[in-house]
Amino acid sequence: MSSRTTSKAYQRGYRSGLEIKIAEQIKSCGIEVEYETERIYYVWPQRDSHYTPDFKIPTKDGGFFFVETKGRFLSADRQKHLLLKKQFPHTDIRFVFSNQNQKLYKGSKTSYAMWCEKHGFTYANKTIPDAWLNE
């Protein structure tokens, strides 16, 4: 991502261009944008940590799920989400990747999408699927 995009994102209260795009999509569906409104406290081995999901999406049954946008999906992010899943198995965290086919690292055969499937995470490419927004 260019520094210009990042600068524009910060000016609008977000950290990336993808977050701006997802916020606009949520708003266009008539859903109030809740960006980084929640913190989930979890234990990183040997230390207490917290995670702030990007977006909180309400569901029609009164529940909600979180959407985490990812351009790069680094090893530390993957480890954090595995810890969160283990410590909060009923918390619904879903990913929207800027490129779900991106490999985890140079030379890897595993894409972001494959990693999500292996570990039981719901994911999408580029935008939030309409089905998610209509739950």
For the regions a protein language model found, what residue spans apply to each?
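Nucleic-acid endo/exonuclease domains
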Residues: M1-E135
